[in-house]
Amino acid sequence: MAKKDVIELEGTVSEALPNAMFKVKLENGHEILCHISGKLRMNFIRILEGDKVNVELSPYDLTRGRITWRKK
């Protein structure tokens, strides 16, 4: 998938699930299932409930996403 096709949104982590999966509540009220991007995983960035994150969504499946950035 090309980088230009992704949808970038902001949200808050509402629940931490096994296997580095998270439920993220988006600003528009939807709740999606997300995994951590490779850069965050390689640099051991910890993501906890309540953290503000940037999420990338594919236009083909709007129920799953990738966490690309954790805000302070």
Swiss-Prot record:
Keywords: Cytoplasm, Initiation factor, Protein biosynthesis, RNA-binding, rRNA-binding. It is found in: Cytoplasm. Signal peptide: none annotated. SMART domains: S1. GO terms for cellular component: cytosol. PROSITE patterns: S1_IF1_TYPE (PS50832). Its main location: cytoplasm. The keyword rRNA-binding applies. GO terms for molecular function: ribosome binding; rRNA binding; translation initiation factor activity. Residues 1-72 form the S1-like domain. One of the essential components for the initiation of protein synthesis. Stabilizes the binding of IF-2 and IF-3 on the 30S subunit to which N-formylmethionyl-tRNA(fMet) subsequently binds. Helps modulate mRNA selection, yielding the 30S pre-initiation complex (PIC). Upon addition of the 50S ribosomal subunit IF-1, IF-2 and IF-3 are released leaving the mature 70S translation initiation complex. Component of the 30S ribosomal translation pre-initiation complex which assembles on the 30S ribosome in the order IF-2 and IF-3, IF-1 and N-formylmethionyl-tRNA(fMet); mRNA recruitment can occur at any time during PIC assembly. Belongs to the IF-1 family. This is Translation initiation factor IF-1. It comes from Clostridioides difficile (strain 630) (Peptoclostridium difficile). The gene is infA.
